[in-house]
Amino acid sequence: MAHKYPVNWFEIPATNFNRAVKFYSTIFAKELPTTHMNGAYMAFFSTEPLDVSGVIISGEGAEPSNKGILLYLNGGDNLNEPLSKVEIAGGTVVLTKTKISDEVGFYAIFIDSEGNRLALHSMN
């Protein structure tokens, strides 16, 4: 069965793999399964078939950046929960929770522990 979403995989590069895994495990309050494959370390956000998922990746060619595309991660029921943990986990909040519209919800932008610029989205 094919994926039904426009995005089916993402990779968040890390120079310090353990620090990055701790950062995302902290802000999302969940353990991320890890593996070493094809010369790279990976920590998986989901391992369910056909989920939109991705990894934290550390290895050749994986270079953190705060330029380029902006990936919006699921902030759950209310993005305040993971956003409140960003600075505790070693990141920086760039844009606090901001309303897009009643129909689209809210977003916030942060820099993770590795220097990547990402966003969180939630309806509440």
Predicted segments with their positions:
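Short hydrophobic/aromatic beta-strand element in the GNAT-like acyltransferase core
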Residues: 42, 53, 107-109
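Core segments of cupin and vicinal oxygen chelate
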Residues: 2, 11-51
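Short beta->alpha transition motifs characteristic of CBS
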Residues: 10, 101, 120-124
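Conserved active-site tyrosine of GNAT-family acetyltransferases
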Residues: 20-24, 86, 115
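Active-site beta-strand termini and strand-to-loop segments that position acidic
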Residues: 45-49, 110-113, 123
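Short acidic/glycine-enriched loop/turn segments that link adjacent beta-strands
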Residues: 37-41, 101-106
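Vicinal oxygen chelate
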Residues: 7-15, 61-87, 106-111
